[in-house]
Structure formats: C-alpha cells, structure tokens
Amino acid sequence: MAQDLTESLNERQNILNNRYALQQAEQHLELGGVYYNGDMVFTKQQVIALYDISERTIERYLLSHDEELKSNGYQILRGVKLKKFKGLASGTDIHDGTKTTVLGIFTFRAVLNMGMLLTESEPAKLLRSRVLDIVLDVMAERSGGHTKFINQRDENYLLAAFQEDNYRQLFTDALDDYVEGNKWKYGNFTNLIYKSIFQENAAEYRRILKLAAKDKIRETMYSEVLTLISSFESGIAYEFEVASNNKGAKLTQTEAKALIQKFEQHPLYKPFIIEARTKMASRDLCFRDALHEKLEAYIKAVPEADFERFLGEKSKSLEEQLSDPETLEVFKRLKDR
C-alpha cells in the first residue's frame, strides 16, 4: 500500500473488497448511521458533517467518481424506497427535510470510499490512516502473522504444488535425455519458462519478494501460476522429445531455446499467461506489498473472492491442511496412481 489512496483506484478497492477489514473498521470507527436493508447507511448531509466539507465539495466528488462510489454502495432513493427509509430514520437527525423527493445515501463501504478520495478534508486524512492500520492488523491476524506464504492458504495450492513437482521431474528428465549441455542448463531453462510466464527470472522474483536464501521460490507461488508452469514443463518436455527424435540426436541449447520461444507464442497459452501475470502482480502488491515492475500493466484490484480464498474461513495454513485426514487421503490416492 505504498501509493496514496486518493490517487489509486486499485489501492482503494483492495481495501473496500476486504470484508474482514471492513468489519473491523465498522466496529472500531463507530461512525453511527441508520440501519437500512441490512446495512448501516448515512445520508449525504451526515457525510458532509463527518468529513467537515461543503455540499459543493461532495457534489464534485459524486460527479467525478460516480461509477466507483455507486459500485461501493452509494445510491439515490426515490418513491417507495425513500418513504421506507424516512420511516426507519424517523427521530434521527438526517438533515434532509420531509419534503425531499430524492435522497442520496452511503453504505459504510461508500463512506470509507469517499474518505479515501477527499484531499481537502483533515477528518478524511485521519480516517485513511486509521483504516490502513486496521487493514494491516487484519492481514497479519488472518494470515498467521506473515504473508510470505499466504499463497499456501489457498485450498487449491497443495494439489497444484504436488502436480507441479511431478511435471518438474518430467521436464528435467527431458533436459537430460534430449538437450545438450552441462548442469547449468537446468537453471537456465527454468528461467526461460519463468520469463515466458511472468517476465522475471528466479533471481528477480526472489529479490522482489525479499526471500531468504533458504526459501524455495515455488513455495511462494500461487496455484494458478504453478499450474501454468506445470503445463509449460509438460508441453516443452514433449516438444524436446519429438524434436530430438526427428533430429536423431540431442538438441543444442540454441535449438531448445527456440522451441521454448515458439511454445510461448502459441495462442492456446495467451489467456492463461495473462491470467497468471494479473493474479501474481495484483495479489503480491495487495498482500505482500511487493511490486513486480515488469508486470505493472497487469495490476488490478484484488476481487472479494480472493480475500475469501486467502483470509477467509476456508483458508488454512499448510500445516493445518497437511494434518487434515481428507487431504492426506487425496494425496495418498494421487501417489498410488
């Protein structure tokens, strides 16, 4: 979260999509509001008072960030909905009068959204600081105190890692059998695959995630990235075998590299490469505060489903997953195939 929230839509949405952070923020900030349709909501006048801004200021932001604010809970009430709201708000100080025919209301999420946009409000600046602290606390608590291996909390991680290990062996065997060269070829060709998928070699990836020398980089990769690496390793191993058999001899490293470059360009892999780059770049910036500069163009806001995947009730540490009898039974069946 290095960027100013007022300047980055993705940074704002990464907070607003994190329901665990929103729950804690709503509890700690105690902003009040009126209970309506399952949410605490606030009128425009209440938001004006909260952030100590003018009506002209809030109208300017409602106009310039209309789509964003509406997607996060801002709505305009008319007719029956407005009548119902006025009935619920009766006796509260909503400051909008009984003759109002349209009324803009903000959910708590939309109130935070407005606070992340306002540059001329000191209360909004203070709120942003408090919210960022809450987000960091929630992230640490729900990820077990660190995010280096947050990828492993995904219930799909173990299976992806298990399969990737098998395909890795297939790939190294193909390098042995069908490609000339010394022991350095394993690292060199692995880096070619990494660069094909996420435009970084192993050393660059390790530096960006600030991994220790003992850390294995594939243990920090998301399941979708591991699965794509598996596809590349399996497919390239096959291409090496076919090309070597057709040649009647081992491939030179130049020939093998050309095959990888051709493999990378196949239209079949384009959507999967884009997905892997987007998820790696977006998740690492959000969860690990790690920026993949070569993938910056792929960064998007992390969707709500990803917060459930890595921080939700179903997410578990690797140790917890490995102690689950059902998980162990699945891996026993896979191993026995």
Give the location of each predicted region.
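N-terminal, Lys/Arg-enriched amphipathic/low-complexity engagement segments
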Residues: 1-30
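DNA major-groove recognition helix of helix-turn-helix
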Residues: 62
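A short, Lys/Arg-enriched interface patch at domain edges and termini
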Residues: 88-130
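Positively charged, phosphate-engaging catalytic surfaces used for nucleic-acid and nucleotide handling
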Residues: 1-9, 117-337
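The alpha-helix within a helix-turn-helix
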Residues: 48
